[in-house]
Amino acid sequence: MAVSSKHIPAPDLHRVRRALLSVSDKTGLIDFAKALHANGVEILSTGGTAKSIAAAGIPVKDVSEITGFPEIMDGRVKTLHPAVHGGLLAVRNDPEHVAAMEEHGIGGIDLAVINLYPFEEVRFKGGDYDTTVENIDIGGPAMIRASAKNHAYVATVVDPADYADVVAELEKHSGSLPLAFRKKLAAKAFSRTAAYDAAISNWFAEAIDEETPTYRAVAGKLHSVMRYGENPHQTAGFYLTGEKRPGVATATQLQGKQLSYNNINDTDAAFELVAEFDPARTAAVAIIKHANPCGVAEASTIKEAYLKALACDPVSAFGGIVALNRTLDEEAAEEIVKTFTEVIIAPDATEGAQAIVAAKKNLRLLVTGGLPDPRAKGIAAKTVAGGLLVQSRDNGVVDDLDLKVVTKRAPTEAELNDLKFAFRVGKHVKSNAIVYVKDGATVGIGAGQMSRVDSARIAARKAEDAAEAAGLAAPLTKGCVVASDAFFPFADGLLSAVEAGATAVIQPGGSMRDDEVIAAADEHGIAMVMTGMRHFRH
């Protein structure tokens, strides 16, 4: 049953006479406390926060003085007391509330400055179970929720970035804070506790291997507001979850304009793809446009890999994203800047490479310090009308699969290497995906078609266009291998690849007509390998 309201109107301006400060993150604390004291605000505080304020010579009263109860149980219980929560929740112009405050000696609290134990930081640093549990804040969220609920009389500050605004408003309004400002702070406060609880619930789900918990929360902290979203009429923001997976969200931007919504989406796709290639074994480069690869290649050097990737589709690569699995060096940088590129993302960049890229002031250069683990568990989420689709991350890696040769002819060692390469790439191409590969480089990519046959034909045509642009007598699909992200439902998709010149095929298998497809491969002397794993991508 819903709780009814007495409909007591909130004052526009409410005088701040008393503040409670209890923070884990002490950024800006002392200057803020000094400003509150200068504005005539009495300061209450807890534990380490009180000690820091007192050490700075600022008058402060420990919360135990108003509760009459010391901190106990290693600080687990210190603010869970009616003297604190009554002061936060009391409706100041309700006679019954005022009478209760007087009867029990409860003083009102007009400003609650609270931030929480660093649970998210401990979680993503891989703290042990007991340490992570100990960093679940109880009293902090309770005070935040209490004060934010009572925003008619209490201002709630959960972010040190808001200290300056609070001081400015106090000085502007002679020691009071306006209702609109208090509402804004309350909204942020509830967002903070929601995100905090989401992090805790998601961690617990992971800890007990619960893949589909009854309640699922996805939360993040605003990192930046985009100029616009996918299109200019859409608004957008970039939120960070706190996960330390190397990538665009955790990268350091060394130069260039602010990343756009599309830049971030494409850069993430590019870096996740290139991470499929072990940098200890090979240098690899992926060029991405609209979240699909234009070209991917491996070689002994980043420069060589880039040139091979670029050759796959140099027209589409214009204005694309370039991702590397090794450090960006001078030789590679000199080649990349010859083509208009939006973003370069790499584990690192030499000083010489940075100097070369600096000549293109709008080119964004990101370094990550490492590569994401393609085998790591994680979630992928997508919104639908009225719901949220959540699935585990596609962390299947072709090197871990039991590949089965299903044709009379087995692939050669060179073909098998290219087949694995092609399947790695196909995992990151929008379905239906067909990828032609030769000598460690894509030579044709067909993406996002409703018909697998059409994807095969588009990939072949792309290869023909690239060959013509390079002055080659024949497209590089002659003698190539082909990967399909899902099974061939009919032999026609395979025959399109054969017509393009493919000599070996890798696909998941699992079609009712696998026998027909295998027979067609045998008829044309094609080697076929089945993986047993599909890589649809929508």
Curated annotation (Swiss-Prot):
InterPro entries: AICAR_Tfase_dup_dom_sf, Cytidine_deaminase-like, MGS-like_dom, MGS-like_dom_sf, PurH-like. It catalyses: (6R)-10-formyltetrahydrofolate + 5-amino-1-(5-phospho-beta-D-ribosyl)imidazole-4-carboxamide = 5-formamido-1-(5-phospho-D-ribosyl)imidazole-4-carboxamide + (6S)-5,6,7,8-tetrahydrofolate; IMP + H2O = 5-formamido-1-(5-phospho-D-ribosyl)imidazole-4-carboxamide. GO terms for cellular component: cytosol. Disulfide bonds: none annotated. Pathway: Purine metabolism; IMP biosynthesis via de novo pathway; 5-formamido-1-(5-phospho-D-ribosyl)imidazole-4-carboxamide from 5-amino-1-(5-phospho-D-ribosyl)imidazole-4-carboxamide (10-formyl THF route): step 1/1; Purine metabolism; IMP biosynthesis via de novo pathway; IMP from 5-formamido-1-(5-phospho-D-ribosyl)imidazole-4-carboxamide: step 1/1. PROSITE patterns: MGS. The keyword Transcription regulation does not apply. SUPFAM superfamilies: Cytidine deaminase-like, Methylglyoxal synthase-like. Pfam families: AICARFT_IMPCHas, MGS. The keyword Hydrolase applies. Transmembrane segments: none annotated. Its EC number is 2.1.2.3, 3.5.4.10. GO terms for biological process: 'de novo' IMP biosynthetic process. PANTHER family: BIFUNCTIONAL PURINE BIOSYNTHESIS PROTEIN ATIC, BIFUNCTIONAL PURINE BIOSYNTHESIS PROTEIN PURH. Belongs to the PurH family. The IMP cyclohydrolase activity resides in the N-terminal region. This is Bifunctional purine biosynthesis protein PurH. It comes from Brucella canis (strain ATCC 23365 / NCTC 10854 / RM-666). The gene is purH.
